[in-house]
Regions:
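N-terminal accessory alpha/beta regions
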Residues: 1-75, 107
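Active-site substrate-binding loop specific to GH73 endo-beta-N-acetylglucosaminidase modules
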Residues: 5-13, 63-238
Length: 238
């Protein structure tokens, strides 16, 4: 039998690195769940929302499977606001869109370091995750929401206290109130409040609620029926 160059005769196959083992295990679990699902719609929704709220394996390959399992799957049959909160606060999303390094220019950490605001998560949340393109938000809204997001980060697992958790680090946070889409947000509670407002907006309903139905070959049909979907979305608290 032909032998690979440099391979020792009779030597056992080497295991892939641990991150690759994790992603292979997560992928197998994902496909097994889809293959054995009694109701296929749930798996279709998991795949749809994982694509809508996509992250990259380039930043941390070992987190991708956990992200879908922890942030997406538990919420596909629940409120969009809860799904959005879980997604935007997951370590995989914070790493992917660089919010772990974002800090306000006037924050304690920002004044003392040559680092500053990162708008990636704020822009993606408004443009792709909730309101959609050409929905009326401005660059000022993106910048101010990025300031709201400062301080919300993830501590690496080796940290002795709260390691691996989504936490608020005040020394990174831009002080003061921020106005986003005409609404004023005050300091620390602003993140959850802003996400709730975005998720319940008419633009978010139009941008996100119809997409799963289009994917599943169910046609919304008339504008009146489409309006019913939008109204139902908002009445349910998104």
């Amino acid at each position: 039998m032909a032998q690979l160059p440099g391979a020792a005769s009779g030597s056992p196959a080497q295991k892939p690195p641990l991150p690759q083992q994790i992603i292979l295990s997560e992928a197998k679990a994902r496909f097994d769940a889809a293959a054995n699902a009694e109701i296929g719609l749930v798996e279709r929704l998991v795949w749809f929302w994982s694509n809508h709220f996509c992250v990259s394996a380039d930043k941390d390959v070992a987190m991708v499977g956990a992200y879908e399992r922890e942030a997406i799957r538990p919420h596909v049959l629940g409120r969009f606001a809860d799904l959005l909160q879980a997604v935007e606060s997951h370590p995989a999303m914070l790493l992917y869109l660089d919010n772990v390094q974002s800090m306000g220019a006037d924050s304690i950490a920002g004044i003392n370091q040559d680092k500053g605001l990162n708008e990636n998560l704020a822009r993606e949340t408004l443009e792709l995750h909730t309101l959609g393109v050409r929905s009326g938000y401005s660059q000022a809204d993106v910048t101010n929401f990025a300031k709201v997001l400062t301080g919300w980060t993830w501590l690496r697992p080796e940290e002795p206290v709260h390691g691996g958790e989504f936490v608020f680090v005040r020394r990174f946070h831009e002080p003061g109130d921020q106005v986003v889409l005409g609404k004023r947000y005050t300091e620390v509670p602003a993140l959850k409040a802003a996400i709730r407002v975005f998720s319940q907006s008419y633009s978010a309903a139009r941008w996100t609620d119809l997409r799963p139905w289009r994917r599943s070959a169910i046609r919304i049909g008339s504008p009146a029926r489409r309006q019913c979907v939008d109204v139902g979305w908002q009445a349910a608290g998104a």
